[in-house]
Amino acid sequence: SPTTGCQQTFEEMMVGLAGQSGHKEMTTVPIVPFGHSAQATFPWNFAAWNPKRTLAIVSFHGDAPRTNLCGYGTANVEWGRTRNINGIPSLMVIGEYEWWQARVRPALAFQMMYPNSCISLLCDAGSGHFDLCDATIDYIGMFIQKVWEQRGESLRRLNPSDGWRLGSPLGSDKEGDPISAFPKEPPAPWTEYTGDPHTSFWYIDEEMARLTAARYAETDGKEDVRKDIVNLDLQHLDIGDTFYVEQGEEAFYICGPVRKVGEKTFEIIPYDCGLDNPKRSHSAWVASVTEGDATH
């Protein structure tokens, strides 16, 4: 919102970046705003204020446009009567960890209120809040590539009726419960879709819609096995001590005063925020990931 100074800060930042980098086009180049978790509301609001700068929108493990459940925990920004994201391709990715029908409903309602919006949904089944698997990386990359091919530097507004539809997965009204049902109706061109249009989402083309359906078919009926694997009190370790994560095939650093020194081994290190932050200094997050099988 301009009242917060964010818009001015962004514009000054891009001018400064253009000057420092020598790339003058940075002041006008199309942008893909990307936000995660508490910042996942940002991409929608950025596009509403900067539609002529926005190539595509990606809200990752986040929320819907104009949601009442902002990840940062306070009220959303009011867009007013004239702002919208009509024709701007948008991708909302929700992991199974944070899946909640109350997160999806605002997106469905938004599409009814703004029928020219182009919102895709990917249920990142089996995923937690901080992990990002190769399949989802490739999915987001393909989405952005296809948007560029259709919009380019002209940033023409897309017509949703030129895309495809696919239904939304269904879950519980209790946050974090496993997905209860994936869409059974096959994806189809926008005007030929035979499922409920009020519970479906837009996809930029056939390949993207079928890829989404294939992701759902691959996980449908399998058991979700997200579990806490370690609760380590770092106060009992010294700088330089290491610990090993036994579970899973791969382990990744998320945050905290540790660094990865082996395939699944981490070392305690001095932390940028110091040692007197009660929330950050003495705890760390790591993720251990295992590929699914026929049942999980």
Where would I find each of the regions flagged by the language model?
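Alpha/beta-hydrolase active-site loop
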Residues: 2-25, 31-33
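Soluble non-cytosolic domains of exported or imported proteins
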Residues: 4-8, 37, 101, 131-134
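Short beta-strand immediately N-terminal to the catalytic nucleophile in serine-hydrolase-like folds
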Residues: 33-35, 60
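Short glycine-enriched nucleophile-adjacent loop
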Residues: 40-51
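The feature captures the conserved acid-bearing segment of alpha/beta-hydrolase catalytic domains
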Residues: 55-141
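Alpha/beta-hydrolase-fold serine-hydrolase catalytic core, especially in secreted/extracellular enzymes
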Residues: 117, 125-256
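Short, solvent-exposed secondary-structure boundary/capping segments
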Residues: 265-268
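Intrinsically disordered, low-complexity, charged/polar segments
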Residues: 282-294
